[in-house]
Amino acid sequence: GAVFTIPADRIEGGTFLCAAAMTGGELCLKGLEREQLGAVSEALRMTGCRLFWEEGGLLWMRPPRRLLSDFSIITGPFPAFPTDMQPLLMALLTLAKGHCMISETVFEARFSQAEGLCRMGADIRIEGRRASVFGVERLFGAEVFAKDLRCGAALLCAALAAEGESLVHGSEFVERGYEKIETALSLLGGEIRLTEQG
């Protein structure tokens, strides 16, 4: 026989890092390896977040008073920036001071979260496989629609950071990829309720 250690989910970890950065909260994650987060942690650093690694796989993240932008991201296979984190980074960048260009090289039509983010007040312009994100001062609660798993997670993170209440349809997509995400995000100070729509 053999013993295997299953690595932590870097996309789930990245989701919580983005949510904390958007809401201005400090976060400690346990169980992730530095190499797993590579390009994600580098992108967070470019927004002004400070990341500290401790022994035993502890990662501390402290966001700046105002997130920063003015850089470009290109998605790609590991170790490049993961396409599954692109919607979350886009959500974060909506509140960053400056402009960022995101180039999606893995999947076509991977910017479905942009429509919902714009309903919340974001300034995003799509041109083919490239998205230009111009940071705004604040987002506002809105009724939005998750069209896939990561789109839903991005909209939830944006709803946490937005002023007022948001209604995010399509929670079944998010529940498929995250275990009790509403509980985890509530630890960041959000008030989330899952409801059945008739």
Annotate each predicted stretch with a short phrase:
Residues 1-198:
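Short, structured segments at the rim of ligand-binding sites
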